[in-house]
Amino acid sequence: MGCVQCKDKEATKLTDERETSVSQHAGYRYGSDPTPQHYPSFGVTAIPNYNNFHAPVSQGVTVFGGVNSSSHSGTLRSRGGTGVTLFVALYDYEARSEDDLSFRKGEKFQILNSTEGDWWEARSLTTGGTGYIPSNYVAPVDSIQAEDWYFGKLGRKDAERQLLSNGNPRGTFLIRESETTKGAYSLSIQDWDETKGDHVKHYKIRKLDNGGYYITTRAQFETLQQLVHHYSARAAGLCCRLIVPCHKGMPRLADLSVKTKDVWEIPRESLQLIKRLGNGQFGEVWMGTWNGNTKVAVKTLKPGTMSPESFLEEAQIMKKLRHDKLVQLYAVVSEEPIYIVTEYMSKGSLLDFLKDGEGRGLKLPNLVDMAAQVAAGMAYIERMNYIHRDLRSANILVGDSLVCKIADFGLARLIEDNEYTARQGAKFPIKWTAPEAALYGRFTIKSDVWSFGILLTELVTKGRVPYPGMNNREVLEQVERGYRMPCPQDCPSSLHELMLQCWKRDPEERPTFEYLQAFLEDYFTATEPQYQPGDNL
């Protein structure tokens, strides 16, 4: 059961979601992590009318909630000929420029213009102020999207991560779109027992033909709100009653502000470098602020590292890549020294985190989960037909609650330093690089898979340099002869077997990132269900 070959190589075969029904505590699933919901891209001039339950779908677009959810699609029409659909703030927001609007959670808005996609022009009914607001900070009044417990397109694994973090009590819950059943939802609840300790149970919420909802046919409800109210009063067959909605973190913004959405080359003087976080071969990383009010990370590149023109061209692509497991590129200063402005990650690089930070004490479940997050981000890069080229723990950043995000994707191609471009030069990361890429420059998503296998060794050894005791030349020679790193101390053989799959000589025989994500997310259920923590892992 544990061997990698026994599993189908393509995760697409693993499509039924593990959910628990009240009457049947069985059922197994795997669904790949969908591209997250945090960045609705509308490109429509009319806002769907969420309050008209029977409005025909005129645009074929559901701004919130996805297919057949309670986001009632249709063009914006006046109710009774006068009013408009009102939106409510889900979070506090502080204006970052003179064009956007500060507001508090619960404030209501009239939307004036939604053509900007990520930013909507709105009028606050509380203050009367007009300006741009981030569209993922608001939801239609009285919709399920406005409920604290509704998390939209959140994958099963991410639901578990959120419920099991921050010391949530038993009965903490959320509702999300089902990954596998169109129009259905999943109720995820944190539970506890003496055998498993803290864990999460998932229940499928099915939809009736007449529009109602049920977990078990014995109890049917017109709305999800009624369902939540019912199970908050009594468990009624669930593992426990619903106690408190899971804390919903602030959504990430796609841009620094509405002003930088299209013009994201920013003046150097708008950035303040506050604290140096790291120093690498090609520059430094700083924690800083933009406009004096927005915390960012700033990567400064040494002059001559890459051509500003080539960088700007690549940055146009990087800016379009949006996924929860990728560090978001916000803006650039393209004149030398080049500045790259991204979201700030509080715990720094995964390498430093494992070697010198809180990561030193992590056990295998956390480490495998971090690997699964990286695989999820790389699966998105795979779907977008992009390549990272320099995947290693130094280029993974860690945030609160052990969130991992991939940084520096695509930049390696642009480096013009001779010690790097020679590929066997001192600055080139030979130990992480697939042989066909190191020897012949054949960089593909499959060479990224090789690098991911090396990153797995970094995780289980808490940041040890790969191929200990060997220099770059020896590594290249030995790997060409068929040498592969042995199983690290205390690492389960099934995980080492996965590494060996990543290090197949023929790139096409290496697994996809979609498969790697599936394998790692299900690792302790399907592969190592008997895992017991040891001294090291």
From Swiss-Prot:
It catalyses: L-tyrosyl-[protein] + ATP = O-phospho-L-tyrosyl-[protein] + ADP + H(+). Residues 271-524 form the Protein kinase domain. The modification Phosphotyrosine is found at residues 420, 531. It holds the Pfam family PK_Tyr_Ser-Thr. Keywords: ATP-binding, Cytoplasm, Developmental protein, Kinase, Lipoprotein, Manganese, Metal-binding, Myristate, Nucleotide-binding, Nucleus, Palmitate, Phosphoprotein, Proto-oncogene, SH2 domain, SH3 domain, Transferase, Tyrosine-protein kinase. GO terms for cellular component: cytosol; nucleus; plasma membrane. It is found in: Cytoplasm; Nucleus. The active site is at 390 (proton acceptor). GO terms for molecular function: ATP binding; metal ion binding; non-membrane spanning protein tyrosine kinase activity; protein kinase activity; signaling receptor binding. GO terms for biological process: adherens junction maintenance; cell differentiation; cell surface receptor protein tyrosine kinase signaling pathway; convergent extension involved in gastrulation; gastrulation with mouth forming second; myelination; regulation of cytosolic calcium ion concentration; T cell receptor signaling pathway. Its cofactor is Mn(2+). Residues 149-246 form the SH2 domain. The modification Phosphothreonine is found at residue 12. PROSITE patterns: PROTEIN_KINASE_ATP, PROTEIN_KINASE_DOM, PROTEIN_KINASE_TYR, SH2, SH3. Its EC number is 2.7.10.2. Residues 13-34 are annotated as: Disordered. Residues 82-143 form the SH3 domain. Inhibited by phosphorylation of Tyr-531 by leukocyte common antigen and activated by dephosphorylation of this site. Relatively inactive in the unfertilized oocyte, undergoes rapid activation immediately following fertilization. Total activity increases progressively during later development and remains elevated during sphere and epiboly stage. ATP binds at residues 277-285, 299. Its main location: cytoplasm. The keyword ATP-binding applies. A lipid is attached at residues 3, 6 (S-palmitoyl cysteine). Tyrosine-protein kinase implicated in the control of cell growth. Plays a role in the regulation of intracellular calcium levels. Required in brain development and mature brain function with important roles in the regulation of axon growth, axon guidance, and neurite extension. Role in cntn1-mediated signaling. Required for convergent extension cell movements during gastrulation, acting with yes via rhoa. May be required for epiboly to occur, possibly through its effects in calcium signaling. Belongs to the protein kinase superfamily. Tyr protein kinase family. SRC subfamily. This is Tyrosine-protein kinase fyna. The lineage of its organism: Eukaryota, Metazoa, Chordata, Craniata, Vertebrata.
